[in-house]
């Protein structure tokens, strides 16, 4: 509604309820346009004066989506929907965009003390999930390195906890694993796993590892099982599975094909078998039945194909799927001249994973080029290299319609790209991304300032593949000022690009300027000391097409529950404040714990459990509330508490039903290097009445202490004892315990009951004399005393005979 108030005054009022009359001039100057100040906005005419005048107005400035050439960059926060072109170095134009010109957001997708870097050109989308592989270590190199990834199932808004894909190399710390090339072909993840030395990061071996990705299939028919057979045949087109891979079945309608199973044999690319626990008398076929099958990445083994030390290779980079059977990986050689850049083509990775073809880009582009990024679209292979020096051009773009046998090539003008240029094809455009290692490094001739605190820039560019001309390519600065927690960033690592729905994702690594390779607070290079190495992975998400969904954005309002709170102690070591409760299995490595209480209910007799890699300890320090008499510690060399899994020692607590008992359980008990002795002299027995040894094997006679200083009541043997002994006869017999073991040995000895009866006949108590024992309802004898008494009795009789000869009582 407009009202004429005079010849020069115009007022208006909005139709919105409650609105008032306003001066039209006031309304028009709320947001000013650069065009109001004479700017051309054609990207060629210098609009610096118009920009200065607009900024002097103090108003917010709308660029109306145009590009304005300037001789110095203005305050970008004052502008909306504006792009500037500025030549910081003459002849090297760069473009800078304000809010509203590009719809993009930056996310930090890892946050831990490891040196998280190298996501180069190996990110991918599988089953609507974005996978961002990278490597996490404790420094630049392979020290404590794990090949890892994070995943996002919500379009990059939240990311998973990092998952390790490799353990330490068996020969660590001499060598360790490393990976710069990874991707999915059909339904398997393929990765070039390099082995490198810790000392020099030198490549010593290459191996192609592959493993099925996790997925869920809803199928109809295709399972058969013949009568009187345990094997069932599964038909799944292009299953991509190998022997030993994990599969899970439900609702199969075929006996035995259910739950977790493993691939038994592979018939062809569409059929495999599983071994069921049973067989039936008739043929089975689930034709027409709906059923489900799942595969698992983590539960399946790696298939590892050793490729040895590939000659003329510094690193293998990037990955591009060619078809359902093969893929390519890029590589470069920069250790010795001449430099080499190219690809490895694996035409049949499923059946012949060790077979590959090596191809190079044109030789004139190889000097000072490195780390190729590779993609394959519609029968065309694209490859982009990065430059390695600031004084010479190195970045180049190549395409091939015959997988690297012939090439069409372009050189990027002006700019030197010290990081890789990952890309994706959207429509007819290649959309490329790259980040500086240090602020103002993008242009040719820039110094190497990686180890200074700065604000490295991130750029993107479009190149139309139909025009195939890089002379007028526009590098657009989309974000900078990356931070690593509390420290300004310096270096930015190599990246990956993927497209999902209406968005393109640039995933790249940042780096703390206190680079652990050289200097800084953390000279020990320990990721768990101080703040570790705040080197993390970022994702820049940019909209590239209209999205027909109502909204795919949300605010993450949940309380984070996947991380343990830590605090920096006064000693520079991160601390977890006690108490801390764990409700599931705990796996630790190089852990120092002052006091640890574990509570678990693994069985009725076990209060607490501690599980270590390859060894087990079950702890019952405190009295178990559910069963106090079960207090004990079990140490088992096997994989459980049962002695059948390995040798075992059980230590009973004072409240145990077998208080303070130690039980040893094993096939052998061997002692090495020292004598076996009791802690206290002459206090304890070896064995007991109900815990007897079958026999003892000795190398010599045992020694029994017979020192007179250790005896009392010394006298000659009573003649009544000798007379009683004369009543004891020697016997031969078999042993019941041996008969139970099907042994039939004849033994010689005395019977304890005969000794007791003989002594009683002379009015003596055999138990008192110690030659006979009676404990726990069982008689025993001391054969050393039996022999002594027999010898004494024999001597006694001989003495009597000699006396009779001497007195002529016998002759």
Swiss-Prot record:
BNR repeats lie at residues 150-161, 286-293, 398-409. Its EC number is 3.2.1.129. Gene3D superfamilies: 2.120.10.10, 2.40.30.20, Endosialidase, domain 4, Endosialidase, N-terminal extension domain, Winged helix-like DNA-binding domain superfamily/Winged helix DNA-binding domain. SUPFAM superfamilies: Phage fibre proteins, Sialidases. The record marks 332, 335, 339, 368, 388-389 as: Binding to sialic acid. The active site is at 371, 386, 437. Keywords: Degradation of host capsule during virus entry, Degradation of host cell envelope components during virus entry, Glycosidase, Host-virus interaction, Hydrolase, Repeat, Viral attachment to host adhesion receptor, Viral attachment to host cell, Viral tail fiber protein, Viral tail protein, Virion, Virus entry into host cell. The record marks 706-707 as: Cleavage. Residues 706-808 form the Peptidase S74 domain. This is Tail spike protein. The lineage of its organism: Viruses, Duplodnaviria, Heunggongvirae, Uroviricota, Caudoviricetes. The gene is GP90.
């Amino acid at each position: 509604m407009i009202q004429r108030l005079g010849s020069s005054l115009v007022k208006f009022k909005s139709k919105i309820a409650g609105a008032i009359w306003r001066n039209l001039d006031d309304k028009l100057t709320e947001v000013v346009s650069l065009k109001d100040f004479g700017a051309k906005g054609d990207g060629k005419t210098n609009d610096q004066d118009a920009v200065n005048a607009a900024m002097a107005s103090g108003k917010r400035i709308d660029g109306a989506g145009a590009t304005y050439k300037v001789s110095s960059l203005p305050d970008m926060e004052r502008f909306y929907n504006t792009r500037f072109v500025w030549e910081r170095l003459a002849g090297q134009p760069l473009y800078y965009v304000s809010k509203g010109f590009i719809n993009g957001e930056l996310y930090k997708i890892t946050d831990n003390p490891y040196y998280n870097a190298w996501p180069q050109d190996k990110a991918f989308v599988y089953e609507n999930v974005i996978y961002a592989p990278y490597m996490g270590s404790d420094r630049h190199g392979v020290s404590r390195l794990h090949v890892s990834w994070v995943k996002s199932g919500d379009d990059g808004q939240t990311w998973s906890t990092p998952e390790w894909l490799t353990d330490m190399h068996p020969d660590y710390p001499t060598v360790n694993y490393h990976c710069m090339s990874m991707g999915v072909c059909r339904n398997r993840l393929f990765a070039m796993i390099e082995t490198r030395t810790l000392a020099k990061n030198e490549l010593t071996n290459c191996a192609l590892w592959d493993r099925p990705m996790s997925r869920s299939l809803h199928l109809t028919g295709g399972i058969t099982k013949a009568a009187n057979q345990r094997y069932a045949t599964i038909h799944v087109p292009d299953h991509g599975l190998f022997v030993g891979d994990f599969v899970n079945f439900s609702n199969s309608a075929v006996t035995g094909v259910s739950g977790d199973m493993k691939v038994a044999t592979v018939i062809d690319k569409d059929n495999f078998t599983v071994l069921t626990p049973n067989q039936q008398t008739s043929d089975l076929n689930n034709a027409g039945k709906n059923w489900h099958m799942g595969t698992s990445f983590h539960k399946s083994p790696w298939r590892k194909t050793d490729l040895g030390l590939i000659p003329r290779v510094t690193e293998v980079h990037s990955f591009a799927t060619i078809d359902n059977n093969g893929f390519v990986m890029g590589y470069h050689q920069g250790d010795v001249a001449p430099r080499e850049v190219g690809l490895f083509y694996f035409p049949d990775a499923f059946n012949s994973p060790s077979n590959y073809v090596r191809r190079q880009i044109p030789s004139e582009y190889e000097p000072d080029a490195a780390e190729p990024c590779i993609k394959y679209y519609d029968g065309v292979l694209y490859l982009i290299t990065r430059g390695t020096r600031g004084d010479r051009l190195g970045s180049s773009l190549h395409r091939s319609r015959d997988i690297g046998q012939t090439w069409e090539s372009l050189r990027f003008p002006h700019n030197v790209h010290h990081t890789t240029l990952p890309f994706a094809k959207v429509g007819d455009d290649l959309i490329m991304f790259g980040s500086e290692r240090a602020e103002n490094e993008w242009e040719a001739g820039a110094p190497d300032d990686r180890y200074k605190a700065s604000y490295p820039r991130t750029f993107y560019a479009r190149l139309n593949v139909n025009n195939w001309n890089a002379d007028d390519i526009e590098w657009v600065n989309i974000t900078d000022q990356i931070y690593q927690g509390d420290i300004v960033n310096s270096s930015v690592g190599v990246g990956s690009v993927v497209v999902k729905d209406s968005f393109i994702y640039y995933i790249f690594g940042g780096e703390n300027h206190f680079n652990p390779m050289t200097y800084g607070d953390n000279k020990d290079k320990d990721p768990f000391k101080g703040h570790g190495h705040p080197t993390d992975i970022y994702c820049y998400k940019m909209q590239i097409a209209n999205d027909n969904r109502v909204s795919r954005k949300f605010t993450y309002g949940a309380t984070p529950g996947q991380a343990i709170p830590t605090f920096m102690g006064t000693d520079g070591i991160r601390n977890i404040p006690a108490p801390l409760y764990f409700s599931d299995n705990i796996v630790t490595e190089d852990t120092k714990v002052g006091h640890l209480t574990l509570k678990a209910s693994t069985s009725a007799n076990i209060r607490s459990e501690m599980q270590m890699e390859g060894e087990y300890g079950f702890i019952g320090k405190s009295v178990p509330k559910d069963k106090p008499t079960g207090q004990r510690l079990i140490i088992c060399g096997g994989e459980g508490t049962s002695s059948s899994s390995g040798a075992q020692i059980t230590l009973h607590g004072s409240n145990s039903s077998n208080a303070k008992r130690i039980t040893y359980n094993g096939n052998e008990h061997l002692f090495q290097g020292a004598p076996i002795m009791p802690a206290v002299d002459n206090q304890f027995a070896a064995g007991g009445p109900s815990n007897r040894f079958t026999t003892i094997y000795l190398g010599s006679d045992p020694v029994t202490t017979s020192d007179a200083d250790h005896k009392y009541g010394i006298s000659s043997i009573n003649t009544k004892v000798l007379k009683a002994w004369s009543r004891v006869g020697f016997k031969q017999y078999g042993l019941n315990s041996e008969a139970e073991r099907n042994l039939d040995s004849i033994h010689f000895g005395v019977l304890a009951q005969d000794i007791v009866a003989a002594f009683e006949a002379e009015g003596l108590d055999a138990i008192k004399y110690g030659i006979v024992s009676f404990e726990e309802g069982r008689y025993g004898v001391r054969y050393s005393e039996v022999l002594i008494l027999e010898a004494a009795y024999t001597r006694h009789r001989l003495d009597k005979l000699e006396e009779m000869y001497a007195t002529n009582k016998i002759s």
